[in-house]
Swiss-Prot record:
Lineage: Eukaryota, Amoebozoa, Evosea, Eumycetozoa, Dictyostelia
Name of the protein in its database record: Putative uncharacterized transmembrane protein DDB_G0288627
Topology within the bilayer: Single-pass type I membrane protein
Transmembrane segments: 382-402
Keyword Amino-acid biosynthesis: no
Source organism per UniProt: Dictyostelium discoideum (Social amoeba)
Keywords, ordered alphabetically: Glycoprotein, Membrane, Signal, Transmembrane, Transmembrane helix
Keyword Transferase: no
Stretches of the chain found on the membrane's Extracellular side: 27-381
Amino acid sequence: MYKFKTNLFLVIYFIAIFSIESSISSFNTEINSNSNSDFGHMEIPKNIEDIPFICYNNLSDSSYYLKNNQYFYEPISTIIDNSVSYFPNNCSNISDKNSLSCCLKIDSDQFKSTMDYITSDSLNTSVIGRLYDCRTNSSLGGGFKIVEDNGNTPDLETMSNELDVIDSRESVKICLSQLQQLQCFKCSQDHKTILRDFHTDLLYRIESDPNHQPLFYIKSSTFKHPIIDTSNDGFPTTGAGGADNTIHYIEKDISKGKSIAICNDYFEKLMSHCQFVNVRGKPLNQLFQPLNGKPAVFDSENYINEIFGITIPNLNEFVYVSSDNLDLFYVSNFNCFKQPIPNFQQPTCSLIINKKWYEKSQNSNDYNNNNDSDNSSFGISIQKYLNSFLNSFIIILIINIII
């Protein structure tokens, strides 16, 4: 009888151990599946806007090209003679797995200037998160650029000690982060398929003010021509003399430059977040307007056949030009830029009292960041498997006592 009890106990024990090990194995599989990078193995995207953008030769799989009359992304890469590549410190979202990195050393100074234009903590630059009145949606002056993980805005400037504002901190943080990451791809020498040719409606670019830089335009070989501002509205005219004899420099031949093409759905999310970010004096979603409200000229099959060697039906591509004629980009559904971006959530209202944020309902300065939900989910997963172990142990103990 004792031997039977012992064997029964061992059988129950091993069943419990097997149950626990299966739970742990399932847990590890769940964690590993969540941590796998999309760059390890990718399925051919079903939608042309789900095309990955990767540095040259990052994937061993070379099937990302025309297949079964479908059009997919394939990097077009050329190594420039006597050039030295480098990997920008600010661009952790891209990889440097080839001697041809995403940027050229000769562009490093200009790239740093462009990145600082967005990320600098100085509120004197032309990129800034603005404050808006909760009731009227009107601008309140002041603003901020830095949003810490806990919601603090150490560089916040206000025109009053107490404000009722739209709590745009999350969207401002997302917008500035996305613009920074976009610059990394814009700098790349490998992503030529997401670039478009210069559009003739952008006739000149004023370069006198370092705080006025294009966000989406990619420079190339140009020459600068001095001009003198003689008009009251600041429109440049050539020649000597004038009211203040302010000398500007313009790029007179910018037709060799390139503009980036942004995917439709990414563009909509980006502009939703960036409506709270002013660029060169205007909310970013208002700074750019579609040219004549019509698709760009590059929607002809002949153009696509010439450049990409394929025929693309239903190509939808618009050119967006800034109101100050400084910048342009394309919104497209073919070979366009796209990266992960959170969905836009309509912000609630908060109080700012002496430069500190408080929830209107509870007068609390707590601010939930996006990582809270992930940490909570992780904790729940661990707790679930610990509970499984504890339940198994209790069952074994009770049966052993009964026997």
